[in-house]
From Swiss-Prot:
The lineage of its organism: Eukaryota, Fungi, Dikarya, Ascomycota, Taphrinomycotina. Belongs to the methyltransferase superfamily. It is found in: Cytoplasm; Nucleus. Keywords: Cytoplasm, Methyltransferase, Nucleus, Transferase. This is Uncharacterized methyltransferase C1347.09.
Length: 284
C-alpha cells in the first residue's frame, strides 16, 4: 500500500465516515451529479450557501426530481456504473435511478460500510448497488472480482486531488470502460478556494492530499487524451459556497473575513467558496 493510499485510509476512518454526509457535501454531490447526468455543455452553476439542507431522506432515488434534460447517454437500458473512490455513496445515490447496477470501490472500510448500509436500508439488493474495499490494482480482470470489470460509465468525484499518479489512475479507469463508455471526473479548479491550501507539507501527507490546489481544466483534459479517451470536454462548472467547520476553514485558502453561521449547539461554521468542474471523455 502506497503512502498516499495509507494516508487516505487512515484519514477516512469510522469517525470521519460517520460525519462525512453533511449539508455541504450533500449539496455538492447533488450539483455534481446533475452535471454528470445532464451534460450541460460548459454551463456554470452557482451553488449558494442558502440551499436547502438536504438530509438523508431528501437524497434522490427517483429520476423525477428537479433534473431535466438528462442526456440520452443515461437513457440506455442495462447501464452499469463504477463509482471509483465512492466514499459514502453520495454520487451513487443520485446516479442509481439511471442504471441497472452500480458498483462502488474505496480503500476505506468505514466509508464502504456507510455506503452499503444506506442502500440496504432502502431495500436495494447488493446485486444492484454494492461497494467493496478495493483499489484499482485489485481490478486486474483475472476473474477474481465479485463483479464484471467492464462498465458503461466510470465516475470519480472529488478524489483526484487525493491521488498521486493521476495518469496511471486515468489509464486504468479508461481500461474498465466498455467501447463507447464514458469516464466522468469531478474535482476542484485550480485558483479557487480549497480546504487544503494552507497546510504544511507534513499535514498534507497525513491527509493523503496529493494535489491540494486543484487542477486546471486542461491538465485533466490532457490526462484523458493520454489515456486514449476521445471527445474529452468540460461538461459543467459550478461555484459552491458551502459551510465548513473551523478546522476545514483554517486549512482553506478562503480570506479570513468569511461569513459565519452560529449553530444552536454552539458550533460556528464558516463560508468557503469552491470552484468545481466535471470533465468527461469517451472510450472508442
Amino acid at each position: 500500500m502506497s503512502d498516499i493510499v495509507y494516508a487516505n485510509v487512515s484519514h477516512y476512518n469510522k469517525i470521519e465516515a460517520s460525519k462525512y454526509d453533511n449539508p455541504s457535501t450533500l449539496a455538492i454531490s447533488k450539483v455534481i451529479s446533475s452535471k454528470i447526468l445532464q451534460f450541460e455543455d460548459n454551463s456554470e452553476t452557482s451553488l449558494r450557501h442558502d440551499l436547502p439542507k438536504y438530509d438523508q431522506d431528501r437524497l434522490l432515488l427517483t429520476s423525477d426530481d428537479d433534473l431535466t434534460n438528462v442526456n440520452n447517454f443515461w437513457k440506455k437500458s442495462g447501464m452499469s456504473i463504477l463509482d471509483f473512490a465512492c466514499g459514502t455513496g453520495l454520487i451513487s445515490q443520485h446516479l442509481f435511478p439511471y442504471c441497472k447496477q452500480i458498483v462502488g470501490i474505496d480503500v476505506s472500510q468505514d466509508m464502504v460500510d456507510v455506503y452499503n448500509e444506506k442502500f440496504r436500508k432502502m431495500n436495494i439488493p447488493k446485486e444492484r448497488a454494492c461497494a467493496y474495499v478495493l483499489s484499482l490494482d485489485d481490478l486486474d480482470g483475472n476473474g477474481d472480482e465479485p463483479f464484471s470489470t467492464e462498465f458503461d460509465a466510470v465516475v470519480c468525484s472529488m478524489a483526484y486531488h487525493h491521488i498521486k499518479d493521476l495518469q496511471e489512475v486515468t489509464n486504468k479507469l479508461s481500461k474498465l470502460l466498455k467501447p463507447n463508455g464514458r469516464l466522468f471526473v469531478a474535482d476542484l479548479i485550480k485558483g479557487g478556494d480549497t480546504f487544503h491550501g494552507n497546510l504544511h507539507p507534513d499535514e498534507i501527507a497525513k491527509l493523503g492530499v496529493a494535489h491540494h490546489g486543484g487542477f486546471t481544466p486542461q491538465s485533466i483534459l490532457n490526462l484523458f487524451k493520454n489515456a486514449s479517451l476521445s471527445n474529452a470536454e468540460v461538461i459543467g462548472k459550478a461555484q459552491a459556497n458551502v459551510w465548513v467547520d473551523e478546522a476545514k476553514y483554517q486549512r482553506s485558502t478562503q480570506s479570513k473575513d468569511a461569513k459565519t453561521l452560529d449553530l444552536a449547539n454552539g458550533e460556528k461554521l464558516y463560508e468557503v467558496k469552491l470552484q468545481l468542474m466535471v470533465i468527461s471523455g469517451i472510450k472508442t
